[in-house]
Amino acid sequence: MTGIERYLLKDQPEPVSHYCHAVRAGDRVWLSGTVGIRPDGSVPSDVVEQFEVAMDNLDRALRATGGRPENIVKVQVFLIDVNDREKINPIRQAYFGEHRPASTLVGIPALVSPELKVEIEAEAILDSGTD
């Protein structure tokens, strides 16, 4: 594969600015920050549900590029309350299983909308499915 492919997915929340959900260049994939907005536009009030929805959105974007969870090499999680990391860690562990990507957690004062509590972005290398 050569060139750059951009993915603007119909089953994802509409971007709030000028970007796409994922970009693939060769075997590298960048997944834009995604939040816990359901396809119907609703937002769960609970951080755990928001993270579950965000992870589902991230996974669908990853799979649209041909990737799988084990291809993810780096994640960044942005939390309004960093103490919520203990609540969302079981979801991460269930998603990644034995695979452990590099990870950064950042506490932030706000996201794009006041009801949002968590956002996740990731990078993947599609031929990196083995540890």
Positions of PLM-derived features:
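Short, polar/acidic, helix-capping and beta-turn segments at strand->helix junctions
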Residues: 1-131
